């Protein structure tokens, strides 16, 4: 009798989450339809180049840096869209991470230009050329597929880590710094992207309009602390050779996303 009573709240909770996930799937289908319109609308406004930058950097160390990958009008449009997003979700993990994030789903409402850029053929072709394999954006239900990382308070940072791969194919992180500056002095912020390879640490340059492509599951990396009167906003995008996932990997991804985007990640 007691066990039956205890099962009632569990079953109710499972049904509630299932209902929320079904409703969210319908919403995602609508957003995917909007994406196609945005690619046409904002892609034309940004006037992304047809030709890729040359030469393409070597990706053998699993990380590559491309300075100035975007024409000024396209970059300015992305930066202005990011600056409109003033309500990032803050997360704090003692001794590891502090900062703000604007999730992929929220960008559809707050900055559709950024969504159109992520889904553009130019970015996909550029990343594929750098990596040496065809890649595609990760799914719309993954809140980390395309997000803004806000470092806007002193001590914002993230410690040493790998990016978990929850997909069947190889998984890549692509960063585009949109703002990286001291607010009172003419210099970059104190926050630095560091990687550790073969027992050595090195800093990766992150001035605005620099594209950093790396295989996060293989490259150990961190971002050092921001100081007072500094601002760093980075567009983070993920691409994959095979963006499909098993049920187990999907469940693990949602659990991870709870730490960054709250309980709503469970029904994405």
What residue spans do the PLM features occupy?
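Residue-level detector of conserved, well-ordered beta-strand and adjacent loop positions
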Residues: 67, 224, 236
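Non-heme Fe(II)/2-oxoglutarate
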Residues: 41-131, 227-268
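Catalytic core of non-heme Fe(II) oxygenases with the double-stranded beta-helix
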Residues: 128-219, 231-234, 241-249
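Fe(II)/2-oxoglutarate
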Residues: 1-59, 258-268
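Short N-terminal helix-initiation segments at or just after the protein's N-terminus
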Residues: 110-123, 138, 175-186, 250-260
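Conserved beta-strand positions that form and line the central face of beta-propeller blades
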Residues: 65, 192, 222
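Short, Lys/Arg- and Gly-enriched loop/turn segments at beta-strand edges
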Residues: 220-226
């Amino acid at each position: 009798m007691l066990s039956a009573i205890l099962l009632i709240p569990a079953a109710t909770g499972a049904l509630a989450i299932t209902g929320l996930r079904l409703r969210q799937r319908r919403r995602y289908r609508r957003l995917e339809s909007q994406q196609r319109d945005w690619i046409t609308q904002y892609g034309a406004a940004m006037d992304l180049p047809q030709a890729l930058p040359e030469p393409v950097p070597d990706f053998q160390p699993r990380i590559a840096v491309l300075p100035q990958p975007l024409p000024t009008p396209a970059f300015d449009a992305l930066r202005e869209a990011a600056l409109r997003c003033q309500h990032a979700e803050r997360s704090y993990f003692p001794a590891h991470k502090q900062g703000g994030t604007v999730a992929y789903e929220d960008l559809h409402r707050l900055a559709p230009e950024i969504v159109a850029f992520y889904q553009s053929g130019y970015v996909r072709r550029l990343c594929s050329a750098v990596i040496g394999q065809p890649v595609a954006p990760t799914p719309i239900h993954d809140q980390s597929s395309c997000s803004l990382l806000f470092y806007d308070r002193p001590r914002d940072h993230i410690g040493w880590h790998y990016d978990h791969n929850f997909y069947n194919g190889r998984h890549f992180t692509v960063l585009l710094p949109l703002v990286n500056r001291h607010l009172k002095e003419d210099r970059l912020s104190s926050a630095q992207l560091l990687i550790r390879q073969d027992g050595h640490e090195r800093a990766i340059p992150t001035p605005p309009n620099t594209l950093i492509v790396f295989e996060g599951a293989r490259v150990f990396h961190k971002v050092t602390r921001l100081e007072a009167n500094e601002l760093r906003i980075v567009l983070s995008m993920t691409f994959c050779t095979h963006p499909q996932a098993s049920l187990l990997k999907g469940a693990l991804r949602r659990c991870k996303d709870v730490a960054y985007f709250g309980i709503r990640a469970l029904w994405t």
